[in-house]
């Protein structure tokens, strides 16, 4: 089923010039980038985006990492895009990520794990609309 998902290339990966490699890996696995832009999150924007994690032990570190430099936000489209993107990324902890996954190849640590991806259709819609207006997203089909 053709669907859309949301992806972030995090500051740790942007700083290390990994944008191209990460996008290539997504495209080679059947996902199309249908919207993309580079932004620098303020602390308030990061807290708003990650509000569901407020109060968790890792929240402050997450906000610090996500505001440490620019990020690349993207809308991806493809068959089962949410599950496919999560498979390509690998689990949050790069130590547990399979060979060939983005996090295994590029993550520095569990906190600096290079990428974020939506985990459900509801999250994808919310996350896409947080960063993109409808006129900024183009269908690949």
Curated annotation (Swiss-Prot):
Chemical reaction(s) catalysed: a 2'-deoxyribonucleoside 5'-diphosphate + ATP = a 2'-deoxyribonucleoside 5'-triphosphate + ADP; a ribonucleoside 5'-diphosphate + ATP = a ribonucleoside 5'-triphosphate + ADP
Database matches in InterPro entries: NDK-like_dom, NDK-like_dom_sf, Nucleoside_diP_kinase, Nucleoside_diP_kinase_AS
First-tier enzyme category under EC: transferase
Keywords: ATP-binding, Cytoplasm, Kinase, Magnesium, Metal-binding, Nucleotide metabolism, Nucleotide-binding, Phosphoprotein, Transferase
Signal peptide segment: none
One GO term of the biological process aspect: CTP biosynthetic process
GO cellular component term, pick one: cytoplasm
Gene3D superfamilies listed in its UniProt record: Nucleoside diphosphate kinase-like domain
Keyword field contains RNA-binding: no
One Pfam assignment: NDK
Cofactor requirement: Mg(2+)
Positions bound to ATP: 10, 58, 86, 92, 103, 113
Family the entry assigns: Belongs to the NDK family.
Role this protein plays: Major role in the synthesis of nucleoside triphosphates other than ATP. The ATP gamma phosphate is transferred to the NDP beta phosphate via a ping-pong mechanism, using a phosphorylated active-site intermediate.
PANTHER family to which the protein is assigned, alphabetical: NUCLEOSIDE DIPHOSPHATE KINASE, NUCLEOSIDE DIPHOSPHATE KINASE DDB_G0292928-RELATED
Assembly behavior: Homotetramer.
Protein's name according to its UniProt entry: Nucleoside diphosphate kinase
Origin species: Hydrogenovibrio crunogenus (strain DSM 25203 / XCL-2)
Lineage: Bacteria, Pseudomonadati, Pseudomonadota, Gammaproteobacteria, Thiotrichales
GN (gene name): ndk
């Amino acid at each position: 089923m053709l669907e859309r998902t949301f992806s972030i290339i995090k500051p740790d990966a942007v700083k290390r010039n990994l944008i191209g490699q990460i996008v290539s890996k997504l495209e080679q696995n059947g996902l199309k980038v249908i919207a993309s832009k580079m932004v620098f999150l303020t602390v308030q924007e990061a807290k708003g985006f990650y509000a569901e994690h407020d109060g968790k032990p890792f929240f402050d570190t997450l906000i610090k990492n996500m505001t440490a430099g620019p990020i690349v936000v993207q809308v991806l489209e493809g068959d089962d895009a949410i599950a496919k993107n999560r498979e390509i990324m690998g689990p949050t902890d790069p130590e547990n990520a399979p060979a060939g996954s983005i996090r295994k190849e590029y993550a520095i640590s569990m906190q600096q794990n290079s990428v974020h991806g939506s985990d459900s259709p509801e999250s994808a819609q919310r996350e896409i609309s947080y960063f993109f207006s409808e006129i900024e997203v183009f269908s690949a089909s």
